[in-house]
Amino acid sequence: MQIAYDTRKDLPCEALHELFAAVCWSDGTITPSMLENFNVPFIHSTLVVSAWAEGKLVGCVRALSDGMFRSVIYDLAVMPEFQNRGIGKELVRRCREHFPDSEWLVGTKTAAGFYEKIGFKPNEDVFLSIPCKWF
């Protein structure tokens, strides 16, 4: 099956929610307001790369970047039945291609092994956060 890649930001909310639920980032419960706004973080991102198979969203990633020094990867997700086919690696590669001289950052513990395999190095800096009201 051929995978097509796209950089449009206005991804369909329902397709994004289905993808996030498939990778267990959502318990499937969603209010109409949440669904209506599900793609807002993507629309406001610097870059979005999505993967499609036969018209179905099977993977995506978004990045925020200052266009020069730092870029941050968010929400890399690939449908379970499409994992281990190089789609996640290709999504990240396409992001890095847009800002090749930028320092790329990603905050994850669960997927650290994946990112190390594609060239990311552990960084001992401490990350702090204020939780989002949606989660």
Task: List the model feature ranges, each with a label.
Residues M1-P32:
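Short amphipathic alpha-helix that is part of the acyltransferase structural core
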Residues S50, K56-S65, V72, A77:
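Conserved beta-strand in the GNAT
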Residues H98, E103-F135:
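Conserved active-site alpha-helix within GNAT-family acetyltransferase domains
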Residues F20-C24, D75-P80:
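Short, basic, glycine/proline-bearing loop/turn elements
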Residues V78, N84-E97:
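Conserved acetyl-CoA-binding loop-helix of GNAT-fold acetyltransferases
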Residues L16, I73, W104-V106:
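Generic structural signal for conserved hydrophobic packing positions in ordered secondary structure
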Residues W25-V48:
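Active-site rim helix/loop that mediates acceptor-substrate recognition in acyltransferases
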Residues S33-N37, E90-R94, Y115:
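A generic local structural motif
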